[in-house]
């Protein structure tokens, strides 16, 4: 969060203005981070994307769920892969509606803090129900549970924005 956040700033729109002004720096930093990790990211993703029945779920809590809603159709049409967007609240309340143990799964989790209880629970449920489950959390918080769990796991790769 920007250092000048206060409830008063949020109420007056200063918070929103700061978030908007922060975007160019944030995108450049994110692209630099991804560029530095490109080889390792490709090494993680390439074998997964070759799996015939791979299911890819884009998920997040609240506004982070909208990311998946926006990009899943484009990714599916441009890659021919099985992408779907499922909010973490849906995954947590009805996991068997979305998690098929017969197919490998790549769960791409979006979360600014990486600490929302439903995001962490979605990862745990995916691991519990899908024997061949992989994770790609994309978060802004290296201290968050999504990031920390991924960097300490053999079946995950984490991206820090």
Residue positions per predicted region:
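Cofactor-/ligand-binding subdomain signature composed of acidic, glycine-rich
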Residues: 1-51, 158-161
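Glycine-rich phosphate-binding loops that contact phosphosugars or nucleotide phosphates
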Residues: 49-161
